[in-house]
Amino acid sequence: MLFLRFKFFNNRLLFVSVLCFVICVSCKREHKEIKIKGEKATELKLPERPNILWLVTEDMGAYIPPFGDSTVVTPHLSKLAKEGVIYPNLYSTSGVCAPSRAAIATGMYPSSIGANHMRTNSFTKERGLPAYEAVPPSNVRMLSEWLRKAGYYCTNNYKTDYQFKAPVTAWDESSPYAHWRNRNDDQPFFAVFNFTDTHESGLFEPYGLREIETRLYRAGDTTYQWKNYGASHANNRMSEAETPQYLSKDTKFNIPPYLPETDLVKRDMWKLYNNIGEMDNQVGAVLQQLEDDGLLENTIIFFYGDHGGPLPREKRLIYDSGLNTPMIIRFPNKLEAETSDPQLISFVDFAPTLLSIIGEKPKEYMQGQAFLGQYKNKERSYIHAAADRFDAETDVIRAVRDKRFKYIRNYRPEQGYYLPIDYRERIPTMQELLRLKAEGKLNEEQMQWFRDVKPEEELFDCKSDPFELKNLANNPEYQNKLVELRKELDRWLTAIGDDANLPESELINKLWNGSNTQPVTSDPKVSINNGNITISCDTEGASVGYKIVTAGNKTSKTWHIYNGPFKMPLGSTLEIIAHRIGFKPSKAIQISTSDL
């Protein structure tokens, strides 16, 4: 679907949306400036303490109509874009989910807190290492905990994957049933819904949507029994015949030049877009709930992906195909509707921005900057990214990008780009690439990923070379830009304390302060004075959560954050857990009023 906009002499805007209900025969993924009404105004007047809704999808490149790709119709996202602002220059800090989600949760770069390897709790045993968690500084809290402290009801539905176990204080609810509808009526909310439809595993064969992807967000429906809650992504698939089809299998796809145009690849492209169609359907279900509740114009709605696309040579890499993900924000009363904000935005900017939106000053430890709200910063000049271990395979790459150029530093130039990652090799396109490589049938652009070695430095003009295939690092005409971005990368590495060459074993030793075992949060201590309960914990930076079970056996529906002394009803029982991020949580302590 293409958006056409015209401005008339009476300054009224006519929005004409051309919906393609007939399957297009030559759909094309555009890599050009989006034709829209104009750029967003410098300042936005936002309501005080608005509700905030995040709609987060996985493995999402710019494969949707608001960003120039009309292959599959997405009526709900297209409407959201029509009523909101599109952000074409959002970049994840990594080309894979867990490190990127760590950045979102903390406002810190993954490589500054030990969250840069994919994942900290898997594929370590095979390398003779223990499973571990990222350990940020002691003053770091999850973004949602800061919002809870500010009075927000915070829900997550339901993926976490932060590279550390979330403290009980992080969310009011985190489950497939988590929903803003469970809050007190007078309470603002921050609600996160994670859509898994577009994950790379959705390209595996046999194809079919999984139960986790067909729920249409049954949040709040506690009578529904989940078959797949907590189980493998791949379980409980419907057959392909049962799976809804959002576009014809005969659709002609604009396949990126780094992939071959074979029937298997075309089928994966069809699955990719079909999954987007289902994701859009689920987004629409959540938005309908918001509208049904009369909350649409009191809520700032974010839609974005957790990194770039799912295909080989996209996910896990720090080319734009792996980092760039579309974002749409709809503001109450359609403020700045149908505009684009071209500023560079990094995932580390989300945490300070949300605090800024609700009038809270961003925390000093946060390495990002606010791009909206009371504490909005001037636009950033660069975004930064890193790639390290993925499952059982390791590389070390760092990158910096401005609005046009990207600089990549390869710390292992003797090693090729391609890594034989078992999970990725379940994708038919990956199997096809390997088959054609073995047969000598890949062209020069497709073979670049399979080079035996790679240059120490790469420089790409992302405007003229959006697929990053032409390295300009040795071109004399671009030496000034090369030096500029090289210096910026060095500055960034020093600023965040990223020792790119640090072996993972030494990283773990550093996170654990020289110990061979993961640190444990001290058990909380409780005292009472004049009827007031006081809780403390000897572990610096530990969050303390508590629940009260009354004499009538009624339990708090959520874990409260301990902020200071409080009174406890007679005959009740107190359950307490202390937890510093990256440490193991304390034991759960239970104390009744009769014990005090």
Swiss-Prot record:
GO terms for cellular component: periplasmic space. It is found in: Periplasm. The active site is at residue 97. Induction: By rhamnose. It is an enzyme of class 3 (hydrolase). Pfam families: Sulfatase. The keyword Calcium applies. Ca(2+) binds at residues 58-59, 97, 306-307. Keywords: Calcium, Hydrolase, Metal-binding, Periplasm, Signal. The keyword Cell inner membrane does not apply. Its cofactor is Ca(2+). Binds 1 Ca(2+) ion per subunit. Its EC number is 3.1.6.-. One of its GO terms (molecular function) is arylsulfatase activity. Residues 1-27 form the signal peptide. Belongs to the sulfatase family. This is Ulvan-active sulfatase. It comes from Formosa agariphila (strain DSM 15362 / KCTC 12365 / LMG 23005 / KMM 3901 / M-2Alg 35-1).
